[in-house]
């Protein structure tokens, strides 16, 4: 009977409690809380209903095993069950799915053919199956005999994207359930192993969702360890997998020494000491970010040697050479192709402006010249006539490029001017973008008027008080007094005073850079829309400028004040663009997530249920952050070249991390409450009452936040029946502790870090991380070209201050205000460079995974009930998308529907590839 029970599945792969108190009607019996949740049933699941088999799983038994049983029954009736069990051997079959590259270079093709040849003579891919049980004789996991993948040589020329290889293992009846598999690649070339499925065990197919590069044994001699899709908490790890679990984590941690190879899979920490390049020029030296002077999150360690001129700076790797990230974090082929196409587009877009800038004036003359970037193509825009081509040989090359790739040299029309060419000029549109644009996370309710600075007057002087008075705004309050407007929650503000003022002297000393520290006061009208009623422009009190340190600009009353107002709004837009890019986008959704990702790979086994939950939300983030260090935030990179703050941009980012960033305030509800945009209200659907009811970012964001939170709670409660399980989960606690104490070491002593002691604590922490990686990043990223591609709407930098009557430039401003306006804006080359970059950053790649989607959705976990719950989560995301579409057609929602008004789709979950101004990917992948 022992043998029969083993065969018929009484001991399943999933070695947990046999309690049947599950709300999911699962085929498996797994200990959990007996609580029904929103996602327990999925009405939209297209898969056929499963039959519930309460008596156990019907085994898939191989023919060899059946024959052996028949012989054993007839010929060995007198033997003991133990001896019978030892004598039974049977075969199981492995199917390995390998993903091919679509394009190979000559070297890769040559090595592939060499591997095909050597595979015939024994240099194979070797697999070894590991049991969940320990062999009592060796005190090590039970193992199968080694097996090789068959027909590698025959299939080497296959053009299919996925190629399936098979292998056969011989195991005996005492083997137990498979829990891991080792892979040894004796070829010269790495390969991408997508999955392995084992068939022939009593429990049915066993899945290994690998999605990993397997390196050649010559580069990495140790065997690759891959686990089944069955999740285990550390305390529940089967005895046969415990050593393997810890060994794999040790492999991923490394020893913190040496320079990393591109084929490595090691996750470790370092400071941002590779932004500058002091070996080339002293002007390219930059301070290290991370430490007491410039606090910052940690990034992935590469181990490169120090520069010659600064032992504390790491030697840079410049394009086209790749930066190190662990091999499985690198972009897959389709993502690489999308990036390469965008780089080509950027090069072509900037080639002609670079040529023109050397021979013609660098400023735009009028709005028509900007418009022609989208309508006529760059050559027509630049006015290269036949006689000019004759004089300059280089433009002949450009002509060829123009004829052969005309589409690449013409910019797409940004959405902000696609419906209404002049919408960006209107005050209501300027204000609307504070709640429905690309940076809707800085607006806050005014609680006292005039606003008060939090800067230290002993450091920044006594002139920190605001120049705003009641007289500046009283005529714009629909008959209310200022106090009444405050009490009825009608006054709001976008305040960049404190974040910019400490840096203005250095910024304004840069060539071609001029900035104020701005405050914009907004009034909530009876229609639920906002209007700007005053803009305060501040300079340091000891500024070298001849201008007053503070001035207030109010809505225009004549032609002169109209141009003053437009220039003031442009300076606000420049402040906003800098904070958006350097703080809200890069710092809060890119850099601050990297430590959590590094710690997850170092401390959470691939078998850990929380790792499986987080996995899709970590995809590509380390790679895109490495690319950012190489080209975007580097010395003289895109950010320094295109934004007002120039080389001081990352210092502003560091100051924001030091003074403003708090993980406990990064979740949407907490952030809305902190900014005074909402108050707790248990009667509302999300427990919050928005003080601006038509706040598209918050309205749609709360839908996604709630769905993510419910999904996370469903998942967490599945594995943690009580708080003690969380407190004693060694891997989970190590992950959170390392994220704080190492990854965010400069904030390690902060009292605001949430505890990780209860189920609710874990739900909150994981929900916040997933929110930041998905919806928050999408809201801040994918509208960059649709809103910022028309540079006058939100110029990334300004080159001139606003003149007043005492300024010598005031006369030229009065004589030709349009010329002064464009001379204040970015130059032609700065504009086209910025447009090319934000076009790339706003692009969805074809392999994007969106919220509610997963690779291998039915086998990413071996917990069938969680698979069902995930399908329920996906269905909820689909309902949210329909609700967002409905809201965008509702004329009562004036901040997202109306003549010339862009619909708010940045949190609409799905998208086609390209620049769409919608779509919520699972992770920070661009």
UniProtKB/Swiss-Prot annotation:
Listed name of the protein: Lipoxygenase 4, chloroplastic
Enzyme class, broadest EC rank: oxidoreductase
Chief place of localization: plastid
Keywords assigned: Chloroplast, Dioxygenase, Fatty acid biosynthesis, Fatty acid metabolism, Iron, Lipid biosynthesis, Lipid metabolism, Metal-binding, Oxidoreductase, Oxylipin biosynthesis, Plastid, Transit peptide
Catalytic activity: (9Z,12Z)-octadecadienoate + O2 = (13S)-hydroperoxy-(9Z,11E)-octadecadienoate; (9Z,12Z,15Z)-octadecatrienoate + O2 = (13S)-hydroperoxy-(9Z,11E,15Z)-octadecatrienoate
UniProt tissue specificity: Expressed in leaves.
BP-aspect Gene Ontology terms: anther dehiscence; anther development; fatty acid biosynthetic process; lipid oxidation; oxylipin biosynthetic process; pollen development; response to bacterium; response to ozone
All copies of domain Lipoxygenase, residue ranges: 231-926
Transit peptide: 1-58
Residues where Fe cation binds: 585, 590, 777, 781, 926
Family matches, as InterPro entries: LipOase, LipOase_C, LipOase_C_sf, LipOase_CS, LipOase_Fe_BS, LipOase_plant, Lipoxy_PLAT/LH2, Lipoxygenase_dom_3
GO CC entries: chloroplast
Functional summary from the UniProt entry: Plant lipoxygenases may be involved in a number of diverse aspects of plant physiology including growth and development, pest resistance, and senescence or responses to wounding. Catalyzes the hydroperoxidation of lipids containing a cis,cis-1,4-pentadiene structure. 13S-lipoxygenase that can use linolenic acid as substrates.
Family: Belongs to the lipoxygenase family.
Cofactor detail note: Binds 1 Fe cation per subunit.
Gene designation: LOX4
Induction: Induced by bacterial pathogens (e.g. Pseudomonas syringae pv. tomato), ozone O(3), and wounding.
Compartments in which it is found: Plastid, Chloroplast
Organism: Arabidopsis thaliana
GO molecular function: linoleate 13S-lipoxygenase activity; metal ion binding
Lineage, top ranks: Eukaryota, Viridiplantae, Streptophyta, Embryophyta, Tracheophyta
Cofactor names: Fe cation
Residue ranges that the Swiss-Prot or TrEMBL entry lists as coiled coil: none
Protein EC: 1.13.11.12
Pathway the protein takes part in: Lipid metabolism; oxylipin biosynthesis
């Amino acid at each position: 009977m022992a043998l029969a029970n083993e065969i018929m599945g009484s001991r399943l792969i999933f070695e947990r409690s046999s309690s049947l108190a599950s709300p999911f009607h699962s085929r498996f019996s797994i200990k959990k809380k007996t609580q029904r949740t929103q996602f327990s049933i999925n009405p939209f699941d297209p898969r056929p209903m499963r039959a519930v088999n309460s008596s156990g799983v019907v085994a898939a038994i191989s023919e060899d095993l059946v024959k052996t049983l028949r012989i054993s029954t007839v010929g060995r009736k007198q033997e003991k069950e133990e001896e019978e069990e030892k004598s039974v051997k049977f075969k199981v079959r492995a199917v390995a799915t390998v993903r091919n590259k679509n394009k190979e270079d000559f070297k890769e093709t040559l090595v592939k053919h060499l591997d095909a040849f050597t595979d015939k003579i024994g240099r194979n891919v070797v697999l070894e199956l590991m049991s969940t049980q320990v062999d009592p004789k060796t005190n090590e996991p039970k193992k199968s005999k080694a097996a090789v993948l068959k027909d590698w040589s025959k299939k080497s020329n296959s053009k299919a994207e996925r190629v399936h290889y098979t292998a056969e293992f011989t195991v005996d009846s005492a083997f137990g359930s498979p829990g891991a598999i080792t892979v040894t690649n004796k070829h010269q070339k790495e390969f991408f192993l997508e999955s392995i499925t084992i068939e022939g065990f009593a429990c049915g197919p066993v899945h290994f969702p690998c999605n990993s590069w397997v390196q050649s044994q010559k580069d990495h001699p140790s065997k690759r360890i891959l686990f089944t899709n069955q999740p285990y908490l550390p305390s529940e790890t089967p005895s046969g997998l415990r050593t393997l679990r810890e060994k794999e984590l040790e492999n991923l941690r490394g020893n913190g020494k040496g320079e990393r190879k591109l084929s490595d899979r090691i996750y470790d920490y370092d400071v941002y000491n590779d932004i500058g390049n002091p070996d080339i020029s002293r002007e390219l030296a930059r301070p290290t970010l991370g430490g007491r002077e410039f606090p910052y999150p940690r990034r992935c360690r590469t181990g490169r040697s120090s520069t010659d001129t600064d032992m504390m700076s790491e030697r840079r790797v410049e394009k086209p050479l790749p930066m190190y990230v662990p091999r499985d974090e690198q972009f897959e082929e389709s993502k690489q192709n999308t990036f390469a196409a965008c780089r080509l587009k950027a090069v072509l877009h900037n080639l002609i402006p670079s040529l023109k800038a050397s021979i013609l004036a660098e400023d735009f003359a009028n709005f028509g010249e900007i418009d022609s970037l989208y309508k006529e193509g760059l050559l027509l825009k630049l006015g290269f006539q036949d006689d000019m081509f004759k004089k300059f040989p280089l433009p002949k090359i450009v002509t060829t490029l123009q004829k052969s790739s005309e589409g690449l040299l013409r910019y797409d029309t940004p959405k902000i001017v696609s419906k209404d060419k002049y919408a960006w000029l209107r005050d209501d549109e300027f204000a609307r973008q504070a709640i429905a644009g690309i940076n809707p996370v800085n607006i806050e309710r005014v609680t006292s008027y005039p606003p008060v600075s939090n800067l230290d007057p002993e450091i920044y002087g006594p002139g920190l008080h605001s120049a705003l008075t009641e007289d500046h705004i009283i005529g714009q309050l629909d008959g209310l007094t200022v106090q009444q407007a405050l009490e009825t929650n009608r006054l709001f503000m976008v305040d960049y005073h404190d974040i910019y003022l400490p840096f203005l002297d250095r910024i304004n000393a840069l060539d071609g850079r001029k900035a104020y520290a701005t405050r914009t006061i907004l009034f909530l009208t009876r229609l639920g829309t906002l209007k700007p009623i005053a803009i305060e422009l501040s300079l340091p009190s000891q500024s070298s400028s001849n201008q007053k340190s503070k001035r207030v600009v109010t809505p225009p009353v004549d032609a002169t004040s109209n141009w003053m107002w437009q220039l003031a709004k442009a300076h606000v837009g420049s402040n906003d663009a800098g904070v958006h890019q350097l703080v809200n986008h890069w710092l809060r959704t890119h850099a601050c997530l990297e430590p959590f990702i590094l710690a997850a790979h170092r401390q959470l086994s691939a078998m850990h249920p929380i790792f499986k939950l987080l996995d899709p939300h970590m995809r590509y983030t380390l790679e895109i952050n490495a690319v950012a260090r190489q080209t975007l935030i580097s010395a003289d990179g895109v950010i320094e070249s295109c934004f007002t703050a120039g080389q001081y941009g990352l210092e502003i980012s560091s100051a924001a991390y030091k003074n403003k960033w708090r993980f406990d305030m990064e979740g949407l509800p907490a952030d809305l409450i902190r900014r005074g945009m909402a108050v707790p209200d248990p009667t509302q659907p999300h427990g919050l009452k928005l003080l601006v009811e038509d706040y598209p970012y918050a309205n749609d964001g709360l839908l996604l936040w709630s769905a993510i939170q419910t999904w996370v709670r469903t998942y967490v409660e599945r594995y943690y029946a009580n708080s003690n399980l969380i407190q004693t989960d060694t891997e989970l606690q190590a992950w959170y502790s390392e994220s704080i104490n190492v990854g965010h070491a400069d904030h390690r002593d902060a009292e605001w870090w949430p505890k990780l002691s209860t189920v609710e604590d874990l739900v909150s922490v994981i929900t916040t991380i997933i929110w930041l990686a998905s919806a928050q990043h999408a809201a801040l990223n994918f509208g960059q070209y649709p809103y910022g591609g028309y540079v006058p709407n939100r110029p990334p930098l300004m080159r001139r201050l606003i003149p007043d009557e005492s300024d010598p430039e005031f006369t030229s401003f009065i004589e030709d205000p349009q010329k002064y306006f464009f001379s204040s804006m970015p130059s032609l080359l700065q504009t086209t460079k910025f447009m090319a970059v934000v076009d790339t950053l706003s692009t969805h790649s074809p392999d994007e995974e969106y919220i509610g989607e997963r690779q291998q959705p039915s086998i990413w976990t071996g917990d069938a009930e969680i698979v069902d719950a995930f399908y329920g989560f996906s269905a909820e995301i689909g309902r949210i998308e329909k609700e967002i579409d409905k809201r965008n057609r509702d004329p009562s929602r004036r901040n997202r529907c109306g003549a010339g008004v862009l619909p708010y789709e940045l949190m609409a979950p799905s998208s086609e590839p390209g620049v769409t101004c919608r779509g919520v990917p699972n992770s920070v992948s661009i």
